[in-house]
Amino acid sequence: MSSRDSDCLHRFVFEHTDVRGELGHLDASWQAVLQRQTYPEPLRKLLGEAMAAAALLSATVKIKGSLHLQLQGDGPVSLVLVEVTARHTMRGLAQWNSEVPESGLREQVGQARLMLTIDPGEGGERYQGMVAVEQDLLQSTLEDYFAQSEQLATRLWLTANDQRACGMLLQQLPGQSDDDEDWNRDVFLGETVSDDELLELSVTDLLHRLYHEEDLRLFEPEPFSFRCACSVERIDTMLRGLGYDEVRDILEEQGKVSVTCEFCRQVYAYDAVDIERLFAASDQPEVPPTRH
């Protein structure tokens, strides 16, 4: 596979139809997630599929802020969370509390829901949609979401290994035609794709293999990269939100205040001088005196 395909999203349309598609391949951006946390194999695959899905979904909606894909349940896997920004930067994490089974999604997450949140940034209203997890595949659960929340015919194919996270999406645009013949044919051909083909074939080779008899137009690739949004400023704001007394209690109990970003594992450490400076610089009308 060429470097042109790596860490990129490729959009395509079937000419003279109401069907559009996307192919996404995450390499270095996916590796950056795995380098920061050791996950059991079944969870690595699920998180990789979620990363690929989030990249695909970010192209189906216009966002100025960020899109979050979240799985939350009471099973061995308690949380999967992926964030994609309007600048095509990504980060992701997962949390688990017991051995993660190899079997389907419902066994892994238990009673769970999938949520998609669009945060438009400053001044905008956040949108969130959700669907219960009733399928054994993440891609099928996302198809349920689109059928119920967006009322858009959507099909996805997702896969991941330790090197790549990949996905393909087909979507029928609303209101352009009452004839489903094109849609049904393109989905039927898409169903013949294998995980190995998604992982190994170049974009042009894969699209030719699937749709060489279709009139297809491929757009320029859109690059994606790993980038964490954590910063000293955000941690400062979080600590101020806890309040001076609680932060001082942590400091006295542990000797320092340490905050680890769950996405990138960056550690932010504060000593007594840092804490006093932090609260002295805040907008609080009164800063409690230093305890001795």
What are these regions (language model features)?
Residues S2-E220, P288-R291:
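Interaction interfaces in information-processing and related assembly proteins
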Residues L189-H292:
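Cys/His-clustered metal-coordination modules, chiefly Zn-binding fingers
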